Curated annotation (Swiss-Prot):
Disulfide bonds: none annotated. The lineage of its organism: Bacteria, Pseudomonadati, Pseudomonadota, Gammaproteobacteria, Pseudomonadales. One of its GO terms (biological process) is glycine biosynthetic process from serine. The gene is glyA2. This is Serine hydroxymethyltransferase 2. It comes from Pseudomonas fluorescens (strain Pf0-1). Its cofactor is pyridoxal 5'-phosphate. It is found in: Cytoplasm. The modification N6-(pyridoxal phosphate)lysine is found at residue 229.
Length: 417
């Protein structure tokens, strides 16, 4: 028998110390990684619940194990809320991650060797959209499109490549693109060549849910997303689609038993909470602020003479090119880290440096907005970053910024009393 008094602190001091240090880091550091956010205590409570004990292969009402009557309720809540949130007819909440959701889509609708057309990783796409190092680039004939000299997707190029290569699937989505995707144009191109249109909205799902970014569900054959990032839920994946019995059956079979075994019902419960939170009016205000904050930060960098890829942002993120400053993303990342500002180095279009070094930084505002930053704080923060980038080796500047960061983090904590 387990005692409910047996806590991590009492049982595993080493692990607990690392967890406490991470909690302190999250409170004292400013988080600007575009794919990161903070979940609510309710989401974390679900992930630490007794639901972690239950195995439930299959789907609600069609399980391979007994004792699933209550996890069926949990999973159906998540399904129904996801469908309501995104206006979808179909939702699969079982994918363990966004990459696994994407792999399931490929497994469902493609055969090995089929041609896919996706955004180049070097131009802002994602590994799972056909990058050569990913299974999506190894199992399928991956053709890549990119951005033009203005930092915008060249839809004429997308259409030309589609006509030339006749892909079975066109992938629309990104990990580092700051503008609005033209889903009707993608749909028209896909229809022209008889391809599936698959949209990976992992980065903007929260914005879509709040109505501040176009919803791809009406245009795509299938849509995937993560449930963290802007959606602010647990780490996990989600597949959505319009009503299509054939595609729905293929997707369900691809997730289970095709790509996964038993679902993580404790994570699915956390997804259900996340979707409920995203259905509230305050979530829309949050997402509107996320975009305002990103635009405020990008504006400061432009004023200070830095190059923002695509000239600005219409979502939660933007890329800063440091080619002109002859600074590597790796060095900039390290210097900002000393000041308790967490970012990630990122390749930029036509980057002369390797992906391990890069010439850019990616910034995102979901996490700082969660802790209460508005435009004023974000402009101030961008100014501090510019001060450091102007002289990476100036320890006095780094020390001064770190103290400012600690002060504003204390003023705007992630988790209040």
């Amino acid at each position: 028998m387990f005692s409910r008094d047996l806590t991590i602190a009492k049982y595993d001091a080493d692990l607990f110390a690392a967890m406490e240090q991470e909690a302190q880091r999250q409170e004292e550091h400013i988080e600007l990684i575009a794919s990161e956010n903070y979940t609510s205590p309710a989401v974390m409570e679900a992930q630490g619940s007794v639901l972690t004990n239950k195995y439930a292969e299959g789907y609600p009402g069609k399980r391979y194990y007994g004792g699933c009557e209550y996890v069926d309720v949990v999973e159906q809540l998540a399904i129904d809320r996801a469908k309501e949130l995104f206006g979808a007819d179909y939702a699969n909440v079982q994918p363990h991650a966004g990459s696994q959701a994407n792999a399931a889509v490929y497994l469902a609708l493609l055969s090995a060797g089929d041609t896919i057309l996706g955004m180049s990783l070097a131009h802002g796409g994602h590994l799972t959209h056909g990058a050569s190092v990913s299974s999506s680039g190894k199992l399928y004939n991956a053709i890549q499109y990119g951005i033009d000299a203005n930092g915008l997707i060249d839809y004429d190029e997308v259409e030309r490549l589609a006509v030339e290569h006749k892909p079975k699937m066109i992938v629309a989505g990104f990990s580092a693109y700051s503008q609005i995707l033209d889903f009707p144009r993608f749909r028209a191109i896909a229809d022209k060549v008889g391809a599936y249109l698959f949209v990976d909205m992992a980065h903007v799902a929260g914005l879509v849910a709040a109505g501040v970014y176009p919803n791809p569900v009406p245009f795509a054959d299938v849509v995937t997303t993560t449930t963290h990032k802007t959606l602010r839920g647990p780490r996990g994946g989600l597949i959505l689609a319009k009503a299509n019995a054939d595609i729905e059956k293929k997707l369900n079979s691809a997730v289970f038993p095709g790509a996964q075994g038993g679902p993580l019902e404790h994570v699915i419960a956390a997804k259900a909470i996340c979707f409920k939170e995203a259905l509230q009016p305050e979530f829309k205000a949050y997402q509107q602020q996320v975009v305002k904050n990103a635009q405020a930060m990008a504006g400061v960098f432009i004023e200070r003479g830095f190059d923002v890829v695509s000239g600005g942002t219409e979502n939660h993120l933007f890329l800063l090119s440091l080619i002109k400053q002859e600074i590597s993303g790796k060095d900039a990342d390290a210097a900002l880290g000393k000041a308790f500002i967490t970012v990630n180095k990122n390749s930029v279009p036509n980057d002369p440096r390797s992906p391990f070094v890069t010439s850019g930084l990616r910034f995102g505002t979901p996490a700082v907005t969660t802790r209460g930053f508005k435009e004023a704080e974000c402009k101030e923060l961008a100014g501090w970053i510019c001060d450091i980038l102007a002289d990476l080796n100036n320890e006095a500047v780094i020390d001064a910024v770190r103290e400012k960061v600690k002060a504003i983090c204390k003023k705007l904590p992630v988790y209040g009393a």
